[in-house]
């Protein structure tokens, strides 16, 4: 072997031992004829000292520069008193270098790798990702990710799950986002689709008797990107037979508790289980951040008789909502701050942001500061009583279609909570349960809230007669306002699956064309089954404190789904397209 130890693993236990290290020059310093090299590998740093008593080694060290790859042999010794570095594992020792070999020289990197902070664009970092990964922060995140997947595998193995791979080349099925399509050369004119999830295959594995399945699965979705989205992402995919929803949630909660305890030293209590209706009512979100102790209060019933159309209209609209958000002690917010919050809710479609500052509530109307009080004077004190307002508070109001109010006020609640440092704890996990089975589109059609294979709590007859009232046996794990996992029990009878397709407007012919393999499987004794999928990238992002999942993926894509490193996606040769029976429109125009 080329080395005996990793740089970052050396401690006082190796004092007086001769060691051989391989790594990169993190920093080089020349102090009065003695050269100091901070050597770095994936485990960390160690200081190497080279003095003129070893002229060959000294000459080599004198030529070495940042990011040179060196092999160094030397003796471990204790650092002189006063030169210890308590911030390093190896901070009590150093290596007196005797032999140095340059394994590879390096050009000057396009950005420094030895600074704690990096002032360079993300795209530039991604273009040189092989260098960016060398930074200790990136190395630690990827190491942490490996620990997460290893612990998950061990947990699931210990609970009887089998690691089974499912196909990457499959067929397009309606799962909500656009598919990435792969043309077939052999079956000209036909296309594979890269899987958005292994959903149907894992259900078929349950029909096949696998009983407990898991997979660290690559998934692909051609959709608009955000901080927590990538065109290709990794899913911890899980499915079980003969367990109910409580069993599955308990099992997955146990895995999450172990993850946080073993890797972060964080101890979770029993996860709260919150119905979807409560989450939307109190937090205007199906993934509420419970660290923030602010709740919305419905006040539409009080607004129905006011003459102020901004409130009266939504109050009388069956699809409208008026929600109040009381922020204790925030009455000192300035007009410019309120204007910024007004702009913020505008991002979500809100037309404005009404507010009341409560200065001296005992004075009634005179003790309030607001441009809307004069329009709602008859009910304003009732409003304040309902929300529990006290002196020094401010109360914000959202009034519009329910979706706009929920999006705007839910986001405002979180933003104000962070801006004013209102969070009461570091971690707040919960399960959101009892989701609606369907939601109505603008054109009056039904669409699945999760996916069309989710088991409803309703009977077949109720699904057919009143789909809007159906709830699903679905559950999402939410952590700090982020959905880290979602799952459900699945439909396992042909009759129910056909009823769901019918409610969604999928004809028998279309169902047979797209899902014949699933429908056929349901004819041969499918067990009751269900599962869950965790977003690995998102989970690791939260656990490491990263601001984007791109910071916990080795080679991510940009927000425009491009790879600056490899220049993917890229044009291909004309003969490759001919083999696939494809001609680009641009080519056709040029040839014409």
Curated annotation (Swiss-Prot):
Q: What is this protein called?
A: Aspartate--tRNA(Asp/Asn) ligase
The UniProt keyword set, sorted, is:
Aminoacyl-tRNA synthetase, ATP-binding, Cytoplasm, Ligase, Nucleotide-binding, Protein biosynthesis
Residues annotated as binding ATP are: 221-223, 230, 483, 535-538
Residues annotated as binding L-aspartate are: 175, 221, 450, 490
Q: Which organism is it from?
A: Acinetobacter baumannii (strain AYE)
Q: Name one GO cellular component term.
A: cytoplasm
Give the protein's biological function: Aspartyl-tRNA synthetase with relaxed tRNA specificity since it is able to aspartylate not only its cognate tRNA(Asp) but also tRNA(Asn). Reaction proceeds in two steps: L-aspartate is first activated by ATP to form Asp-AMP and then transferred to the acceptor end of tRNA(Asp/Asn).
Under the heading Pfam families, the entry gives:
GAD, tRNA-synt_2, tRNA_anti-codon
* Organism ancestry: Bacteria, Pseudomonadati, Pseudomonadota, Gammaproteobacteria, Moraxellales
Q: Assign the protein's first listed, main location to one coarse class.
A: cytoplasm
The answer to keyword Nucleotide-binding applying to this record is yes
Q: What class of enzyme is it?
A: ligase
Q: Where is this site: Important for tRNA non-discrimination?
A: 31, 82
Region annotated Aspartate, chain positions:
199-202
Q: Which family does it belong to?
A: Belongs to the class-II aminoacyl-tRNA synthetase family. Type 1 subfamily.
Assigned EC number: 6.1.1.23
Query: What GO terms in the biological process aspect are recorded for it?
Result: aspartyl-tRNA aminoacylation
Catalyzed reactions: tRNA(Asx) + L-aspartate + ATP = L-aspartyl-tRNA(Asx) + AMP + diphosphate
This protein's assembly is summarised as: Homodimer.
Its annotated compartments are: Cytoplasm
ATP-binding among the record's keywords? Answer: yes
Recorded GO molecular functions are: aspartate-tRNA ligase activity; aspartate-tRNA(Asn) ligase activity; ATP binding; nucleic acid binding
């Amino acid at each position: 072997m080329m080395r005996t130890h990793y740089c970052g693993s050396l401690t006082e236990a190796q004092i007086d031992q001769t060691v051989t290290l391989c790594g990169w020059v993190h920093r080089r310093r020349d102090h009065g004829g003695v050269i100091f090299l901070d050597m770095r590998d994936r485990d960390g740093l160690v200081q190497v000292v080279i003095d003129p008593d070893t002229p060959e080694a000294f000459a080599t060290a004198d030529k070495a520069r940042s990011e040179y790859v060196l092999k160094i042999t030397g003796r471990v010794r204790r650092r002189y008193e006063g030169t210890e570095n308590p911030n390093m594992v190896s901070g009590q020792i150093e290596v007196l270098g005797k032999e140095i070999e340059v394994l590879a020289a390096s050009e000057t990197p396009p950005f420094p790798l030895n600074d704690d902070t990096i002032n360079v664009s993300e795209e530039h970092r991604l273009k040189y990702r092989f260098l960016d990964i060398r930074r200790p922060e990136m190395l630690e995140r990827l190491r942490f990710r490996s620990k997460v997947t290893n612990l998950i595998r061990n947990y699931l193995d210990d609970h009887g799950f089998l690691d089974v791979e499912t196909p990457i080349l499959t067929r397009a099925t309606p799962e909500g986002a656009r598919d990435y399509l792969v043309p077939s050369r052999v079956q000209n004119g036909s296309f594979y689709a890269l899987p958005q999830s292994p959903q149907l295959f894992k259900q078929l594995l349950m029909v096949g008797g696998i009983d407990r399945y898991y997979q660290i699965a690559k998934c692909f979705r051609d959709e608009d990107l955000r901080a927590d989205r990538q065109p290709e992402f990794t899913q911890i995919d899980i499915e079980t037979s003969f367990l109910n929803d409580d069993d599955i949630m308990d099992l997955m909660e146990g895995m999450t508790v172990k993850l946080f305890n073993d890797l972060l030293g964080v101890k979770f209590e029993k996860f709260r289980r919150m119905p979807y209706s409560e989450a939307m009512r109190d937090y205007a979100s199906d993934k509420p951040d419970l660290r923030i102790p602010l709740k919305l209060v419905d006040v539409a019933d009080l607004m129905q008789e006011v003459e102020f159309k901004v409130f009266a209209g939504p109050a009388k609209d069956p699809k409208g909502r008026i929600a109040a958000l009381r922020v204790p002690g925030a009455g000192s917010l300035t007009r410019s701050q309120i204007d910024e919050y007004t702009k913020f809710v505008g991002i979500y479609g809100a037309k404005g942001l009404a507010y009341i500052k409560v200065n001296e509530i005992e004075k009634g109307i005179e003790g309030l500061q607001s441009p809307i009080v004069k329009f709602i004077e008859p009910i304003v004190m009732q409003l304040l009583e309902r929300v529990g307002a006290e002196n020094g508070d401010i109360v914000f109001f959202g009034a519009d279609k329910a979706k706009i109010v929920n999006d705007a006020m839910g986001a405002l609640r979180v933003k104000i909570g962070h801006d004013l440092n209102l969070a009461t704890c570091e971690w707040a996990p919960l399960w959101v349960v009892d989701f609606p089975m369907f939601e109505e589109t603008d054109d009056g059609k039904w669409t699945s809230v999760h996916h069309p294979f989710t088991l409803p709590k309703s009977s077949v007859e109720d699904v057919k007669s009143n789909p809007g009232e159906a709830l699903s046996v679905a559950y999402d794990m939410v952590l700090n306002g982020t959905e880290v996992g979602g799952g459900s029990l699945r439909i396992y009878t042909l009759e129910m699956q056909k009823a769901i397709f019918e409610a969604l407007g999928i004809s028998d012919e279309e169902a047979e064309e797209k899902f014949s393999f699933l429908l056929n499987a349901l004819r041969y004794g499918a067990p009751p089954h269900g599962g869950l999928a965790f977003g690995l990238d998102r989970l690791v992002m939260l656990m490491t404190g990263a601001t984007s999942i791109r910071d916990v993926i080795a080679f991510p894509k940009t927000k425009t789904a491009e790879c600056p490193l490899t220049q993917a996606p890229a044009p291909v040769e004309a003969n490759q397209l001919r083999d696939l029976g494809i001609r680009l429109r641009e080519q056709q125009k040029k040839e014409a």
